[in-house]
Amino acid sequence: MYYDTIVVGGSIAGLLTAREVSSKGFSVLVIEEDYEIGTPEHCGGLVSIAGLEELGIIPSKKTFDHMIESAKITSPNGENFTINSKNQKVIEISRRELDKQVAFQAQKNGAIIKVRTSFQEITKTGIRTNEEEIDCKIFVDARGVSSLIHKDRTGILSSAQYEIYADWIKKGKVEVIFDQEKYPGFFAWIIPSDEGKGKVGIAGKGVNVSDTLNEFLKQKGEFSTIRKIFAPIWIKGPIKRFVEGNTVIVGDAAGQAKPTTAGGIFTSGMGGVYAGQAIAAFLKTNEREELDNYQKKWTERFGKEFEKQLLARKILERMDNQTINKLFETITPDIINEISEKDDFDFHTSSIIKLLGIKGSLKTAQTLVSGELKKILG
């Protein structure tokens, strides 16, 4: 059996790659090791409407949960402030339904999708699965963070996310909690799916994520757990090469998730779109430079922002709770209003800088990170 392109991994980036390649009339097979497209759903599910539109997705009723109205940011000592996020037009979506929606788009273009089919290895002419050998011209690695584990473990954090029912979850109101002792290098989050229902998670370096999340929930109040997801997240930015021979790497497998939040529906999704367009052009012309255009386009679009986010991550990792508390004290109503007025959810380094109070306390921050701070502010 032969396909022009085989995509391993049925998540957003892989499915968008398949959609783009098949839209040009080329044969595409997508294989997914899980029993269903869209599982396990380890994504928080936040994305801007503008981002979805650029990906070519109009969320269906099943996909769209609700608009996010605000984000409450809490420091280690419990001080907090709230950002109005209505201007950013951020929505909470069901990743399971979003992935299925894109799978349907790809299938309508002619792509074949198979679940409960696992990739085993690359062969001379294609790949071997748990069922058979299949020939192809292009192999797309969309396996997520699992594809990176053997390459560089230093960019990986453990995470846990529970889907729960709890009266203290309020529709439209996201919460982010910083605490370098409990969630070193990351944070805890509450993302509502509806009134009294949502996703609560934590990530951090060297922590027992299950115990830490259980303790966090215990302190919040009564709840019922309906789903638990444990998954590694990648925070080190893009890998060096998105294309190696006839292998094209997309999404989390290519490090296309944001270094600050590990979110990547838009940035990874655009990786899939650019990759699919490049693969289709290559299959038509057989010119290798067509494949190289994928990394070139993605880097032109997201490269500088990801560099700044990596620097912001370095700053956060060097701060202790005392420093974060002091920086939170410098956040003024003007800073909060400035962030609230922004309408760009997907390019947000400037907001992160202000959230940490760095512009309001340049002296303090400079003693922490010196030259790195100048780069990120520049």
Region spans (language model):
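A conserved beta-strand/loop capping segment in the N-terminal third of enzymes
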Residues: 50-101
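FAD/FMN-dependent oxidoreductases across multiple families
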Residues: 206-284, 293
